[in-house]
Amino acid sequence: MAKWSYSSLSLFKQCPRKYHRLRVVKDIRQEDNTALIYGKEAHKAAEDYVRQDTVIPEKFRYLEPYLNILKKLEGEKLCEHEMGLTKDLEPCGFKDKNYWWRGIADLIVHHNDTAYVIDYKTGKSSRYADVKQLQILSVATFKHFPKVNYIKAGLLFVVSKDLIKTNYVRNQVDSLADNFRFDVERLDKAYETDVWNPVPNFTCRKYCPVTDCEHNGGYV
């Protein structure tokens, strides 16, 4: 049984060989680029501000208006909230040995039967926004918070000032989880057969750390 997260499954879908080298063999590392470092710092600034009113660093001050709106929502606010699910979609700890999926919600605000699930994005455009990340986070939220029956989820693009919204109800849990079954089964099969074929993609030429792959721009 392959364990997965939204990011690891996305990596596998992009290129099984890249996934294998980074997540299985672990003989190479993906160095953090400027955009990734910036995103991590922005997430930390948002977490500290919502959790404990820590002053936001000047370069992230543009986040404050959006975070103030979120802070005014009624309910308990959980920042960088870790959740896990077993293969039977039962809630478990993020670090439990029997976890099947795990993920971190940037912000969950829950009150009575309703929860907000927010993921911050620091990319310059929301053009290719993928709400599937919200789908699996919402499944986990329903499972970890049994009193929640309604979820208002959103990808908050703080740079482009866009909010990609979607709503879910509890009886959608199974159908939302099914959206990932095909790709997870492919991942299981790759582990079973130890076959990790490369898939040429936009990262090959300049951004892939698997430099000994024939599709890599630095391959000799």
Residue ranges and their predicted role:
Residues 1, 16-29, 114-118, 183-194:
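Short amphipathic alpha-helical segments and their helix-coil junctions
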Residues 45-117, 125-127, 132, 143-154, ...:
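Catalytic cores of nuclease domains that cleave nucleic-acid phosphodiester backbones
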Residues 2, 6-55, 80-81:
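Nuclease catalytic cores
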